[in-house]
Amino acid sequence: MSTFAPQLAVKATYMRGGTSKGTFFNLEDLPTSCQVAGSSRDNFLLRVVGSPDPYGKQIDGLGNGSSSTSKVVILSKSEVPNHDVNYLFGQVAIDKAMIDWSGNCGNLTAAVGSFAIANGLVDAANIPDNGICKVRIWQQNIGKTIVAHVPITNRQVQETGDFELDGVTFAEIGRAHVWTPVTQWYL
């Protein structure tokens, strides 16, 4: 009789930023072996997204067979002075076992501030009751500072509105929380 390892549940958030979608993780929620760069982290993230997939569909993961949706983001509280959050971006290849950690995704950068606030990575004292919260992001891949301006209503990220973006059907920021591998979804 074969024995199998138990399924691993890891908190993740599937978000849209601009015209891209990706799976977001708080670094602390990843398995310990995946909290540092290396094959354990990459193999785990490849599995979450569903790569490599010789059919190019990523049916067995959260990717969607498109470079616009085959992306991962890892965020953590920043220890870089004058920054709230560290942002690490990975572009996941669809048909091969590779993650490119060398660049940034401007589209998903638009979702980093919202995720950081909603997941307690921004000091609560810096979040206004209403208005705009400036989230100071250290983009680890390229070593640059990015400042996100996130609308806040009643101390929560404002995820609805009427802004329209070419190539995106709906105005609001889409966010779904998942426990990966895909075992539970909640909105």
Where are these regions (language model features)?
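Positively charged, low-complexity/disordered segments
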Residues: W179-L187
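A glycine-rich beta-to-alpha transition motif near the start of alpha/beta enzyme domains, typified by
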Residues: M1-R175
